[in-house]
Amino acid sequence: MTKFSLHKEGLLTIGFTLACTAVAFFFVPALGLCGICVAALVTYFFRDPQRAIAISKDFVLSPADGLICKIENALPPQSSELVEEMQKISVYLSPLNVHVNRIPVDGIVRKLHYVPGKNLRADYDSSEDENERQESTIEMADGRNVVVVQQTGFLARRVVCDLRKDQQVSAGKRFGIIKFGSRVTVYIPKDMPLLVSEGQTVVAGETILALLSETASLVTERFLD
């Protein structure tokens, strides 16, 4: 059975919603019933389920739950200081998706860059350059880099990233959350064979986006986290 838990970032919001619901019940019971529905939705949003993480050094895992809305070749963010085009995979998260983000590859966090911005709808292409976002560059053991961009959306108002510069990270581990409807984009080297396509639904920490090389094996064990 999958363990149900809540992300720590949601505890204060859930507590505040429950407190408002209690007050509403005292003054206007009908409004309190509406508050229960809101509290249930907020609790559902901040769920943090266990995932069956692939144990392998040969994969790029999805950093987010959602729908792959675009795959293309593009230059990575300037903050990465990478000058060659990479494969860009964008995942759109609806308000109903799990919003906890997970590390796509093993490596070391080399660069972290926060960009303040707007809150346009995350499914608009223009939102990538204009919305608030967090850009994180991870260097793998072979010297290649992967860049992850957490981006807010129309409902999302805050990006949370728990990474530190020079931190050693493991694929599949939690590293942050985006609060309410958003987009996560991952940039990977062009020589990595892709295993996904546009329109595909992906699961953070479980779905394999790409192989690190042509000879990498898909056979792997998994652990719950």
From Swiss-Prot:
It is a peripheral membrane protein. Its EC number is 4.1.1.65. The active site is at 182 (schiff-base intermediate with substrate). Keywords: Cell membrane, Decarboxylase, Lipid biosynthesis, Lipid metabolism, Lyase, Membrane, Phospholipid biosynthesis, Phospholipid metabolism, Pyruvate, Zymogen. The keyword Transcription regulation does not apply. It is found in: Cell membrane. Pfam families: PS_Dcarbxylase. Coiled coil: none annotated. Pathway: Phospholipid metabolism; phosphatidylethanolamine biosynthesis; phosphatidylethanolamine from CDP-diacylglycerol: step 2/2. Is synthesized initially as an inactive proenzyme. Formation of the active enzyme involves a self-maturation process in which the active site pyruvoyl group is generated from an internal serine residue via an autocatalytic post-translational modification. Two non-identical subunits are generated from the proenzyme in this reaction, and the pyruvate is formed at the N-terminus of the alpha chain, which is derived from the carboxyl end of the proenzyme. The record marks 181-182 as: Cleavage (non-hydrolytic). InterPro entries: PS_Dcarbxylase, PSD-A. GO terms for molecular function: phosphatidylserine decarboxylase activity. Heterodimer of a large membrane-associated beta subunit and a small pyruvoyl-containing alpha subunit. Belongs to the phosphatidylserine decarboxylase family. PSD-A subfamily. This is Phosphatidylserine decarboxylase proenzyme. It comes from Neorickettsia sennetsu (strain ATCC VR-367 / Miyayama).
